[in-house]
Amino acid sequence: MKLFVGLDVSSEKLDACFMTDDSTCSVLKEASYGNSQLGASQIKEYILEFSQKFEIESLVIGMEATSLYSFHPAMFFKEDLELNQLNLMVSVEQPNKIKKYRDIFEENKNDQIDAFYIADYFRIQRQVNSIIKEEEYLALQHLTRTRYQLIKQLVRTKQHFIENIYY
């Protein structure tokens, strides 16, 4: 049996939905946790509890890519040794793909429902083993973006200066 954990990540909290792939697609638990190491540890404890209770063969933790908010939970789960023994796959998916899947079902939108649809999205075999950027690549990404912004500002300043000289 597989366990799917859908996480709706925001700046302050992680809304989680724990779902199995059995014939009834059981939702084992839905809850909110803080977007902190304590909140991620609580989710980990429930995962370990469910893995013992239901003999989980593999584990998929899926979440939407939400800038920096999803980075820390993704790295926490990906680097955890106990979770890696459960045949773990952490996947960070583009929000527009999950939104299109969710739009098929006409239901109100809230964080708990979003977590359910994220888990369900990964349950129907849509998960891919996404590349979670390592720290070195993130630093390079930030430096590249900063350089790009500085160049744009420099060009804008030069244009402003030239306009003031000739007018």
Predicted regions and their residues:
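Phosphate- and other anionic-substrate recognition elements at nucleic-acid/protein interfaces
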Residues: M1-Y167
